């Protein structure tokens, strides 16, 4: 469950929620043009998700310039105006998102 009673059944939101909590805790703003997706395993690995290509296309339509996605998952997309950044672990995502 997400705060406020919103129920989420899609594990692809795991990484985005984790990053949002960390961002709030560290009082650091994220770039508003970054989309984040990925399931987070108990040991911090970012697991593959369903419908990745569809999610990337939709993120581009919504105006995102960059999307963080699970490493090791094929996304056979060309011709889009969005940077696809692959991460294998939570620490990789944090380094990319919170670099100074």
Q: Can you annotate each of these PLM segments?
A:
Residues 1-100:
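Peripheral, non-AAA+ core regions of ATP-driven protein-machinery
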